[in-house]
C-alpha cells in the first residue's frame, strides 16, 4: 500500500518555479527567403525592391524636362513649322520624344549622323539659338521662295524655320562663298543641307546650274557633296529629298560654305550653353507637375530602396534595376508557432525554443517566469538593442553600397548598326541578369545570417542562464529551467541581470534534488514489483484459458487427444 501511495505521489508532483528564454512574436505575415528555406514568416522585414511609380513625367531636381510632344529631335532643331513652340526652349533636365513622332523631317530625306546628334543632345541641358547668317543677306539668291507643301503652316507652304532653301534669282545662281567665325565662348551646333532633285528639269528650274556641289570646311571637316538626281517614290507628295548635316564649331574657329546650287543654308545655330547629365527618353506620357530624383519612361520613382523593377531605362539618381519580383531583408526573428530543430547554414543552433511570445512587446529576446507570486514577461533590452543596432547598420550598409547614382538610358543606332545594337542589347541583358542574380543571392545569404543571428542571440541568453543556475535547476528541453528551490521575483530578477547567487540556493536545491531522486528510485522498485506480479498473473490466467479450451474441444470431438508411451 505504501508503495502505491509513493507512485501516486510521483505522478502528482507539483511543478516548481520556472524561468524560460524566448523571443518576441507578433501578428506579422511578412515572409522572406533564405538559402535554406522559402517563405519564412518573420516578425519584421524590410523591402528593398521598389515596384511603384507615379505614372507621370516629372521635373528632375526642380528642372523641367523638354517634352517634344509630336515633334522629333530633328523637327525641333531644324524648326519644323509644326514645332514652333520649341523655337526657343529653357534649360531642361532631360528630353522626351515619342516612339513615332509625326513632326520630324517634313520634307522627306535623311539626317546624316542623326544618332550621334541625339547622343550630343543627351549630354546637353541647354542650348541657345543665335542667328549666324541672316536671311536678308542673300541678296543674289532667292531666300524666300524655298518652301514646300510638305511643310505646311496655316494652310500654306512653308519650310524649316532655322535653315534657308536658296534658289535661283533672276534666272541666276552665283557661286556662294560664305565664312562664319565663332566668336562665342561656347561650342556652336551648325546645321545645313543639300537638295537632291527628282529630275534634271527640277534641277535647272530651281538652281539654273546643272552640275552643282555643296562644299563645307572647318579646321576638322572637309566635305564636298554632289546632288544625286534620281527618280524616287513620292513621300509627303515629294519625289525629291533633302539630306541634312551638322557639325560642332569650336570657339574662335571658322566654317566656310561654297556652293553653286542645291544648298540649304543655315540661318540659325545653337550655342551649347550647358552640358550635363541629360538623356533622350522615349515616352508617351505628359508632364505631371511633379518633381523627382529618378525618372523612367513609365513614371517617376521616389524611393530610397537600392533596387527597383519598374523599367530598365532610367534617368537621375535611381536604384539599380533588377528583374526580381521580391527582395525582402529579414530584420526580426522568425514568427512561427513551432520551430523545427535544425542547425542553420552559418552554424547557429536553432530549435530549442518551442515558440515565440506575443506577450513580450518591448524586446526581441527575453524571459518568462512563473512562481508563487505569479508570472510575467521581461525583455532583455541589452541584447535586443545590440541586435537592432547591428541589423540596422547592416541594412543601411547594404542600401548605401547599392543605392548609388545610376542611370541607364537607351542608345541610338542607325540601320547599318543593327548587329551592334543587338549585341548591345545582349550585353545589357547579361548585365541585368548578373545584377539580378547578385541581388537575390545577397538577400538570401543576409536573411540566412540574420535568422541565425537571432537564434544565436537566444541561445546565448539560454547559456547565460544555464551557466548561472548549474545544478540548482533542471533543463526542461524547451528553453525553460525548473528550479530545485523557491525562486521569488527578486531571485528571478537576479537570474535575468546575471547576479544570481548560486551558493545561496545550492543547499536547498541539493536537498530537494535528492528527495526527488529518492522518490524516483523507490517508485522504480515499486514499479518493478508491480510489473512482476502483473506478468505472473496474466501468464497464469492465459494457461487456465488454454487448458479449459482444450478440455472442451476434446469432450465434443473437435480435438483428439492421444497419449503415446
Swiss-Prot record:
Cytoplasmic side: 550-565
Disulfide bonds: 20-480, 58-290, 71-83, 106-151, 294-318, 487-491
Keyword field: Clathrin- and caveolin-independent endocytosis of virus by host, Clathrin-mediated endocytosis of virus by host, Disulfide bond, Fusion of virus membrane with host endosomal membrane, Fusion of virus membrane with host membrane, Glycoprotein, Hemagglutinin, Host cell membrane, Host membrane, Host-virus interaction, Lipoprotein, Membrane, Palmitate, Signal, Transmembrane, Transmembrane helix, Viral attachment to host cell, Viral envelope protein, Viral penetration into host cytoplasm, Virion, Virus endocytosis by host, Virus entry into host cell
Ranges in the topological domain labelled Extracellular: 17-528
Site (Cleavage) location in chain: 343-344
Topological relation to the membrane, as annotated: Single-pass type I membrane protein
Gene Ontology BP terms: clathrin-dependent endocytosis of virus by host cell; fusion of virus membrane with host endosome membrane; fusion of virus membrane with host plasma membrane; viral budding from plasma membrane; virion attachment to host cell
Covalent lipid adducts (S-palmitoyl cysteine), residues: 554, 561, 564
Residue ranges crossing the lipid bilayer per the database entry: 529-549
GO molecular function per UniProt: host cell surface receptor binding
Reported modifications of this chain: Palmitoylated.
Glycosylation site positions: 26-27, 39, 142, 170, 181, 302, 497
UniProt keyword annotation of Zinc present: no
One Pfam family per UniProt: Hemagglutinin
Any GO CC annotation of this UniProt entry: host cell plasma membrane
Described purpose of this protein according to its UniProt entry: Binds to sialic acid-containing receptors on the cell surface, bringing about the attachment of the virus particle to the cell. This attachment induces virion internalization of about two third of the virus particles through clathrin-dependent endocytosis and about one third through a clathrin- and caveolin-independent pathway. Plays a major role in the determination of host range restriction and virulence. Class I viral fusion protein. Binds to sialic acid-containing receptors on the cell surface, bringing about the attachment of the virus particle to the cell. This attachment induces virion internalization either through clathrin-dependent endocytosis or through clathrin- and caveolin-independent pathway. Plays a major role in the determination of host range restriction and virulence. Class I viral fusion protein. Responsible for penetration of the virus into the cell cytoplasm by mediating the fusion of the membrane of the endocytosed virus particle with the endosomal membrane.
Family assignment from sequence similarity: Belongs to the influenza viruses hemagglutinin family.
Other facts: Major glycoprotein, comprises over 80% of the envelope proteins present in virus particle. The extent of infection into host organism is determined by HA. Influenza viruses bud from the apical surface of polarized epithelial cells (e.g. bronchial epithelial cells) into lumen of lungs and are therefore usually pneumotropic. The reason is that HA is cleaved by tryptase clara which is restricted to lungs. However, HAs of H5 and H7 pantropic avian viruses subtypes can be cleaved by furin and subtilisin-type enzymes, allowing the virus to grow in other organs than lungs.
The protein's assembly and partners: Homotrimer of disulfide-linked HA1-HA2.
Record-given protein name: Hemagglutinin
Encoding gene per record: HA
Amino acid at each position: 500500500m505504501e508503495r502505491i501511495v509513493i507512485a501516486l505521489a510521483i505522478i502528482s508532483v507539483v511543478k516548481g518555479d520556472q524561468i524560460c528564454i524566448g523571443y518576441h512574436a507578433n501578428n506579422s505575415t511578412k515572409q522572406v527567403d533564405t538559402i535554406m528555406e522559402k517563405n519564412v514568416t518573420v516578425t519584421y522585414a524590410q523591402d528593398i525592391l521598389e515596384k511603384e511609380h507615379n505614372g507621370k513625367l516629372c521635373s528632375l531636381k526642380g528642372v523641367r524636362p523638354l517634352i517634344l510632344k509630336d515633334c522629333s529631335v530633328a523637327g525641333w532643331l531644324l524648326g519644323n513649322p509644326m514645332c514652333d513652340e520649341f523655337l526657343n526652349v529653357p534649360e531642361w533636365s532631360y528630353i522626351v520624344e515619342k516612339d513615332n513622332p509625326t513632326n520630324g523631317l517634313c520634307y522627306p530625306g535623311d539626317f546624316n549622323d542623326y544618332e550621334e546628334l541625339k547622343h550630343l543632345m543627351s549630354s546637353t541641358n541647354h542650348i541657345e539659338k543665335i542667328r549666324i547668317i541672316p536671311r536678308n543677306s542673300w541678296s543674289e539668291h532667292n531666300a524666300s521662295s524655298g518652301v514646300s507643301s510638305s511643310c505646311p503652316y496655316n494652310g500654306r507652304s512653308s519650310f524649316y524655320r532655322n535653315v534657308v532653301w536658296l534658289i535661283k534669282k533672276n534666272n541666276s545662281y552665283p557661286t556662294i562663298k560664305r565664312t562664319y567665325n565663332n566668336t562665342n565662348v561656347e561650342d556652336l551646333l551648325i546645321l545645313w543641307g543639300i537638295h537632291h532633285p527628282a529630275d534634271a528639269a527640277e534641277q535647272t528650274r530651281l538652281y539654273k546650274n546643272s552640275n552643282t556641289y555643296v562644299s563645307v570646311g572647318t579646321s576638322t571637316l572637309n566635305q564636298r557633296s554632289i546632288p544625286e538626281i534620281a527618280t524616287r517614290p513620292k513621300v509627303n507628295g515629294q519625289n525629291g529629298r533633302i539630306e541634312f548635316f551638322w557639325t560642332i564649331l569650336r570657339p574662335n574657329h571658322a566654317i566656310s560654305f561654297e556652293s553653286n546650287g542645291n544648298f540649304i543654308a543655315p540661318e540659325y545655330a545653337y550655342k551649347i550653353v550647358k552640358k550635363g547629365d541629360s538623356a533622350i527618353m522615349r515616352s508617351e506620357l505628359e508632364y505631371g507637375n511633379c518633381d523627382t530624383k529618378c525618372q523612367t519612361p513609365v513614371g517617376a520613382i521616389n524611393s530610397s530602396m537600392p533596387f527597383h523593377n519598374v523599367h530598365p531605362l532610367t534617368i537621375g539618381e535611381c536604384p539599380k534595376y533588377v528583374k526580381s519580383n521580391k527582395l525582402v531583408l529579414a530584420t526580426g526573428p522568425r514568427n512561427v508557432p513551432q520551430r523545427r530543430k535544425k542547425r542553420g547554414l552559418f552554424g547557429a543552433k536553432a530549435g530549442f525554443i518551442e515558440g515565440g511570445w506575443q506577450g513580450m512587446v518591448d524586446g526581441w529576446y527575453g524571459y518568462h517566469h512563473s512562481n508563487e507570486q505569479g508570472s510575467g514577461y521581461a525583455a532583455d533590452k541589452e541584447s535586443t538593442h545590440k541586435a537592432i543596432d547591428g541589423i540596422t547598420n547592416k541594412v543601411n550598409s547594404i542600401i548605401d553600397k547599392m543605392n548609388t547614382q545610376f542611370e541607364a538610358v537607351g542608345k541610338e543606332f542607325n540601320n547599318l548598326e543593327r548587329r551592334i545594337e543587338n549585341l548591345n542589347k545582349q550585353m545589357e541583358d547579361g548585365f541585368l541578369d548578373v545584377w539580378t542574380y547578385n541581388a537575390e543571392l545577397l538577400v538570401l545569404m543576409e536573411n540566412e545570417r540574420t535568422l541565425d543571428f537571432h537564434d544565436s542571440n537566444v541561445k546565448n541568453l539560454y547559456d547565460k542562464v544555464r551557466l548561472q543556475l548549474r545544478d540548482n535547476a533542471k533543463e526542461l528541453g524547451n528553453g525553460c529551467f525548473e528550479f530545485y528551490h523557491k525562486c521569488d521575483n527578486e531571485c528571478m530578477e537576479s537570474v535575468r541581470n546575471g547576479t544570481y547567487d548560486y551558493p545561496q540556493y545550492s543547499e536547498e536545491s541539493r536537498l530537494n534534488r535528492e528527495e526527488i531522486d529518492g522518490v524516483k528510485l523507490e517508485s522504480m522498485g515499486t514499479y518493478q514489483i508491480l510489473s512482476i506480479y502483473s506478468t505472473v498473473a496474466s501468464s497464469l490466467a492465459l494457461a487456465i484459458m488454454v487448458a479449459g479450451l482444450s478440455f472442451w474441444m476434446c469432450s465434443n470431438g473437435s480435438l483428439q487427444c492421444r497419449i503415446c508411451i
